[in-house]
């Protein structure tokens, strides 16, 4: 019963709690144990469900024929560049917010729609911070490609979720089912902290990006080992 408990789906949690208490001869009226076990099993099943939702979004390729995808891309531009209109859909202007060429769709190949959704979420919920970081990214010596780095950090957040490293963080953030919102919030933390880290480290050039990205990755993994960790900008 206990071994199976960590694999239950959300609708089965209540029954599983009763079964465990019966198996271990724990009084059903012991509400403290019952509540804690219920929350723990919800968190475990919720983590798995969140990963599946994130993975499904990652698997959706950016489609320039999809109106919703295009609207999100234009929204990203408008959030970051409110005083400058796009002259065309295919334009070198996209490089101004850190895409590699004149059509951002090619930059989303690795992380699919998840990369765009993350970028839009940060720009929408932390607009001032996003514009400030975009400004930092244009630094003459320490500059980097804002959107490309943002998508790279989506991959970091995704891999940490996939390998289970985000469990303590998410269990501390929400006593129940973690939602996509909580993944986005962690992503926002990564973007904000990476920008600080990059300028503190002062790399010689963007050519050393992978080296410093890995150093930042190790720093985050170290923080996530703390069982009391909460890594959000709201915190």
Language model regions located:
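Extended acidic/polar regulatory tracts at the flanks of large eukaryotic scaffold/adaptor proteins
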Residues: 1-235
């Amino acid at each position: 019963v206990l071994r199976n408990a960590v694999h239950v789906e959300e609708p089965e949690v209540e029954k599983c709690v009763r079964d465990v208490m019966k198996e271990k001869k724990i009084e059903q009226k012991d509400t403290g144990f019952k509540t804690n076990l219920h929350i723990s099993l919800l968190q475990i099943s919720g983590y798995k469900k969140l990963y599946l939702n994130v993975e499904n979004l990652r698997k959706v390729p950016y489609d320039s024929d999809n109106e919703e995808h295009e609207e999100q891309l234009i929204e990203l531009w408008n959030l970051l560049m409110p005083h400058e209109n796009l002259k065309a859909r295919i334009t070198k202007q996209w490089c101004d917010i850190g895409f590699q060429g004149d059509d951002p769709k090619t930059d989303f190949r690795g992380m699919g729609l998840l990369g765009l959704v993350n970028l839009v979420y940060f720009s929408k919920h932390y607009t001032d911070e996003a514009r400030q970081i975009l400004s930092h990214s244009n630094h003459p010596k320490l500059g980097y490609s804002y959107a490309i780095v943002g998508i790279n950090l989506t991959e970091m957040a995704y891999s940490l979720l996939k390998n289970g490293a985000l469990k303590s963080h998410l269990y501390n953030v929400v006593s129940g089912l973690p939602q996509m919102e909580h993944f986005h919030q962690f992503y926002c933390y990564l973007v904000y902290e990476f920008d600080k880290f990059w300028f503190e480290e002062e790399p010689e050039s963007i050519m050393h990006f992978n080296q410093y990205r890995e150093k930042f990755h190790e720093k985050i993994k170290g923080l996530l080992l703390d069982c009391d960790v909460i890594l959000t900008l709201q915190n």
